[in-house]
């Protein structure tokens, strides 16, 4: 697929793109559909959607009983899915979808889009790292 944001798909963030088919074959039906929707969001720079779907995908991968997850030990699963970065991503997603107070990127300022783009770049980097760790352990 072709992506439009150079920042989101910089050299550090090409893992998901370069390994799309490999990743997709290890996902269950729920995760696979979310992964497809995520790639569509990346194509069109839908920053909020990228953040929301990336965090959701991490949770689905952890809980959808696929052969790759079933092959991991409890320690490996905790190590991968309970990292500081994964927690940041979940908290960021939750602050978007469960409004409690204004957050960076959604304040109505002219810098909002830049902040959301930066969050999206970080998000894709986190998801790529998690997917890479899972695939290395298979």
Where are these regions (language model features)?
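Amphipathic alpha-helical interface elements
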Residues: 2-73, 81-88
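Charge-enriched, short contiguous segments at helix-coil
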Residues: 79-138
